């Protein structure tokens, strides 16, 4: 237990320019607490590694590895002469060898090793910058730290109890710079988490160490009541409950890994999302629920470009098996089902437009394929706020605002903290603007 410790996570959006690294140095240097840093790969590096794996070209592996090296050296010249130069060069040699090996014998393990190189190089680069500024630190790779992952990909979670039992950091003498996004499985093989998994690395470490708080540094001011992509003057949210944050993480722009708050819940540890470059903004704090006398919608999550997939169901006795079969085949294909509603005679699933054709092909290949049709695209709106699910006033506000603007809104499901609806894709922007205005979410 290191109650005075803080965990700081720096993602790829904060690892783009030299100014970003200088800002990280200032943040680390100004802290009076013991610190653990978690890093993602430099901006764009993971995508480049993925592209290289997909191309599968042996002829350009040397040039590709050299370009990855140059990306880090141009941003962090100190890495070429500092204490981590040998480890930096060896990591690049291993990357090149693994790329050649993957061409000969592709495997999930080799692929994970290649992709994890981005985080390893990032940790070495950041250590080089910090060391050059007289900040004592060391790279702490996940396989060395003992970050064990149960499951993999979007379903992967970190074994917090195992970290708690075995992790030893001497934080008084050196700041560990931990690689995010990946860990090891029971066979000691590199295993990746899902998109945004570095968030989960940071919160799992915070829970294991019983740290004071965890901060995820970003390139924006905090969480807004509406995603910035819609260009509406949205309110900045100073506080979110764990539950509200999970809903927004699932049904909005990627602001946080959906599982990131889970290690923190039972301990009540706070999580902050803060802008790296703005000292005057506290960002958004995430923590336990705060009871209010009058429930209100605090934010709207929005998932556009979804295709409703209508499936005809047979007799009552075959409904559950059919839905289970469809869910299983789509799950195996990694097709996310954002909503599933069953009624007498039919089921309605929401999948992304991009996945709709693939989903129907899978259904048509079943031994006894069900009848199905793809309906016009919709947008899923999630109205988020503690206690809104059963609040008649909130329900009436949404319905009356939609009726006043002739918005074809359809209610899907609700929970204690969220109300979910769909609107036709072509009505997305007007629905967001009119509903957000009625719910007082705009400035």
Which residues does each PLM region occupy?
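Short secondary-structure capping/turn micro-motifs that flank functional sites
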Residues: 145-148, 222-223, 279-281, 346-347, ...
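Nucleotide/pyrophosphate-binding catalytic subdomain
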Residues: 1-256, 261, 352, 422-427
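Short phosphate-binding/catalytic loops that engage adenosine nucleotides
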Residues: 33, 135, 269, 335, ...
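A conserved active-site cap/scaffold subdomain adjacent to cofactor or substrate pockets
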Residues: 241-315
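A conserved regulatory-domain signal marking ACT and ACT-like small-molecule sensing domains
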Residues: 283-443
């Amino acid at each position: 237990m290191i109650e005075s410790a803080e965990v700081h996570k720096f993602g790829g959006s904060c690892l783009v320019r030299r100014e970003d690294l200088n800002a990280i140095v200032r943040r680390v240097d100004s802290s009076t607490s013991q610190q653990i840093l978690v890093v993602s790969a430099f901006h764009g590096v993971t995508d480049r590694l993925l592209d290289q794996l997909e191309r599968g070209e042996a002829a350009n592996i040397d040039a590709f590895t050299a370009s990855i090296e140059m990306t880090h050296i141009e941003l962090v010249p100190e890495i070429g002469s500092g204490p981590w130069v040998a480890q930096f060069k060896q990591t690049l040699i291993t990357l090149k060898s693994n790329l050649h090996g993957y061409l000969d014998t592709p495997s999930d393990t080799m692929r994970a090793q290649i992709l994890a190189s981005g985080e390893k190089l990032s940790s070495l680069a950041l250590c080089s910058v910090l060391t050059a500024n007289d900040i004592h630190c060391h790279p702490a790779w996940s396989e060395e730290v003992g970050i064990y992952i149960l499951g993999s990909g979007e379903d992967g979670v970190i074994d917090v109890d195992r970290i708690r039992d075995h992790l030893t950091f001497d934080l008084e003498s050196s700041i560990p710079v931990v690689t995010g996004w990946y860990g090891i499985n029971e066979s000691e093989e590199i295993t990746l988490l899902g998109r945004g998994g570095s968030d989960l690395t940071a919160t799992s470490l915070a829970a294991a160490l019983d740290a004071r708080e965890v901060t995820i540094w970003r390139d924006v001011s905090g969480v807004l009541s509406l995603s910035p992509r819609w260009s509406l003057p949205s309110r900045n949210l100073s506080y979110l409950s764990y539950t509200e944050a999970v809903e927004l993480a699932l049904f909005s722009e990627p602001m946080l890994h959906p599982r990131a708050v889970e290690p923190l819940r039972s301990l009540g540890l706070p999580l902050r999302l803060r802008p790296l470059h703005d000292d005057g903004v506290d960002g958004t704090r995430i923590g336990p629920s705060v009871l209010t006398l009058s429930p209100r919608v605090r934010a709207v999550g929005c998932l556009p470009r979804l295709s409703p997939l209508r499936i005809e169901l047979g007799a009552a006795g075959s409904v559950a098996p059919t839905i289970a079969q469809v869910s299983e085949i789509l799950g195996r294909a990694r097709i996310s089902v954002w909503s599933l509603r069953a009624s007498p005679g039919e089921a309605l699933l929401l999948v992304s437009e991009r996945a709709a054709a693939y989903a129907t092909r899978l259904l048509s290949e079943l031994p006894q394929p069900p009848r199905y049709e793809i309906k016009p695209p919709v947008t899923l709106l999630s109205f988020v706020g503690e206690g809104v699910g059963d609040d008649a006033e909130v329900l009436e506000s949404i319905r009356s605002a939609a009726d006043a603007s002739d918005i074809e809104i359809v209610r899907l499901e609700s929970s204690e903290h969220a109300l979910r609806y769909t609107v036709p894709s072509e009505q997305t922007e007007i629905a967001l603007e009119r509903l957000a205005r009625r719910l007082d979410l705009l400035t």
